[in-house]
């Protein structure tokens, strides 16, 4: 079952990306390194509620 999630920057807390994940294979919170246009650098983005 795929669910839609939002990824937020860990530096500035801006919600920059929307994506989906498979809850069965990834039950814990997802963290990806993505570009933040507010910080103007690549930072870790963590799944939010």
From Swiss-Prot:
PANTHER family: 50S RIBOSOMAL PROTEIN L33, CHLOROPLASTIC, LARGE RIBOSOMAL SUBUNIT PROTEIN BL33C. NCBIfam families: PRK00504.1 (NF001764), PRK00595.1 (NF001860), rpmG_bact (TIGR01023). PROSITE patterns: RIBOSOMAL_L33. It comes from Alkaliphilus oremlandii (strain OhILAs) (Clostridium oremlandii (strain OhILAs)). One of its GO terms (cellular component) is ribosome. One of its GO terms (molecular function) is structural constituent of ribosome. Belongs to the bacterial ribosomal protein bL33 family. The gene is rpmG. This is Large ribosomal subunit protein bL33. Keywords: Ribonucleoprotein, Ribosomal protein.
């Amino acid at each position: 079952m795929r669910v839609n999630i939002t990824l937020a920057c860990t530096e500035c807390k801006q919600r920059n990306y929307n994506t989906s994940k498979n809850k069965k294979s990834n039950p814990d919170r997802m963290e990806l390194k993505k570009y933040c246009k507010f910080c103007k650098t690549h930072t870790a983005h963590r799944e939010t509620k």
